[in-house]
From Swiss-Prot:
PANTHER family named in the record: CROSSOVER JUNCTION ENDODEOXYRIBONUCLEASE RUVC
GO cellular component terms given for this protein: cytoplasm; Holliday junction resolvase complex
Chief subcellular location: cytoplasm
Organism: Solibacter usitatus (strain Ellin6076)
SUPFAM superfamilies for this protein: Ribonuclease H-like
Binding site for Mg(2+) 1: D7, D140
Protein name (database record): Crossover junction endodeoxyribonuclease RuvC
InterPro entries in the record: RNaseH-like_sf, RNaseH_sf, X-over_junc_endoDNase_Mg_BS, X-over_junc_endoDNase_RuvC
Gene name in the database record: ruvC
Length: 166
């Protein structure tokens, strides 16, 4: 299965595409969609949606996974993040890609085995699980890959359970 993971942010939206059989994962591509804080917010949302649309067209994922909104200290930041997530989810849905949402705790549990893991621990496990020669430098791209791995693992478990139950 091919999975697109998205880690939303108003200035940096991480993305990562993996191929997976549920147990073995391979990175296809990863990166960051960057928008300027000097740009009007509506323009930044448009740039994020356009970039995601292009990534979906280029990599043709079967599934997409997006991290749920965490509880931010700053309400304005949380609201902006919610807008970015809305654009991401709409873009994914318009492309006909099945998507799922996972909390940061679920992603960390799935990838590291500990829901309160540090970012550096997540980065190291992403490197290990994808058999990469080095850690992904961008936390945003690494987080997006972790989200994709989380979904691939959940999807494989769901499919295996469905087969057993008939």
């Amino acid at each position: 299965m091919r999975v697109l993971g998205v880690d939303c942010g108003s200035e940096r939206t991480g993305w990562g595409v993996i191929d997976s059989d549920g147990g073995c994962h391979r990175m296809v591509a990863a990166g960051v969609i960057r928008t300027s804080p000097k740009c009007p917010f509506d323009r930044r949302l448009l740039e994020i949606g356009t970039a995601l649309r292009g990534l979906i067209r280029e990599h043709t994922p079967e599934f997409a996974a997006v991290e749920e909104v965490f509880h931010a200290v700053n309400a304005k930041t949380a609201l902006k993040l919610a807008h970015v997530r809305g654009v991401a989810l709409l873009t994914i849905a318009e492309a006909g890609v099945v998507f799922a949402e996972y909390s940061p705790l679920e992603v960390k549990m799935s990838v590291v085995g500990y829901g309160r893991a540090e970012k550096s621990q997540v980065q190291m496990m992403v490197q290990s699980l994808l058999r990469l020669p080095e850690v992904i430098a961008s936390e945003d791209a690494s987080d997006a890959l972790a989200i994709a791995i989380c979904h691939a693992t959940h999807q494989a478990t769901h499919e295996a359970t469905s087969r057993r139950l008939g």
